[in-house]
């Protein structure tokens, strides 16, 4: 009997393959930021979902978190362009963690779908090595929507799969345990 291979959060984040957006379930008492430890060389940017209730607020929060250039136009096309560029933020890959994601565009499913499409387009461009910055190589780009189990029920359709943040033992990796000195 062969062991079932389970994709860990770390191996998922290092991958330059879809899915580009995933739902990260945060347990009571946990902070989303504590669940995501970016692999070496990958940039982790935290976007506050509570600040993304309308498209205008979402654009402002992304501009703040990702330090968009002054020319950012605060519209969907400009967001898509900046997410596929990021030359001012050099890294081997990108992880966007949206905390309190149940608050992202809660009253407009059409705008929410547009937002997801833009994130997936950016992920695909980076994953195919077609993003700006002359990447020419597949680059990880993932967006984690962090919600509690209770908040998850607030949106009927998230449009993405859940990813497990629980530590998973990978085949061939031995965990170091602290030695006890007597």
What are these regions (language model features)?
Residues 169-174:
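Acidic, His- and aromatic-enriched active-site or binding-groove loops in soluble protein domains
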Residues 42, 92, 139-141:
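Short glycine-/polar-rich loops that comprise or flank the Walker A/P-loop
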Residues 80-110:
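Short, structured protein-protein interaction patches enriched in aromatics and acidic/basic residues
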Residues 104-168:
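Helix-rich interaction surfaces within compact, conserved domain-sized segments
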Residues 160, 179-182:
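Mixed-charge, glycine-accented linear interaction segment located at domain edges/termini
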Residues 2-53, 134:
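N-terminal intrinsically disordered, cationic/polar leader segments
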Residues 46-49, 96-100, 144-146:
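Conserved beta-strand segments of the P-loop GTPase G domain that flank and frequently precede/overlap
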């Amino acid at each position: 009997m062969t062991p079932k291979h389970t994709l860990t959060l770390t191996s998922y984040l290092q991958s330059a393959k879809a899915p580009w957006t995933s739902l990260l379930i945060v347990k009571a008492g946990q902070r989303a930021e504590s669940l995501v430890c970016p692999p070496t060389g990958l940039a982790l940017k935290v976007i506050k979902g509570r600040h993304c209730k309308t498209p205008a607020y979402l654009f402002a929060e992304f501009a703040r978190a990702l330090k968009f250039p002054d020319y950012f136009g605060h519209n969907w096309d400009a967001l898509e362009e900046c997410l596929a560029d990021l030359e001012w933020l050099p890294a081997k890959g990108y992880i966007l963690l949206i905390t309190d994601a149940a608050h992202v565009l809660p009253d407009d499913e059409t705008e929410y779908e547009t937002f997801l499409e833009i994130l997936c387009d950016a992920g695909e461009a980076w994953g195919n090595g077609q993003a700006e910055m002359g990447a020419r190589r597949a680059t990880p780009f993932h967006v984690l929507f962090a919600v509690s189990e209770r908040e998850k029920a607030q949106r009927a359709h998230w449009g993405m799969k859940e990813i497990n943040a629980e530590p998973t033992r990978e085949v061939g990796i031995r965990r170091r345990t602290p030695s006890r000195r007597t």
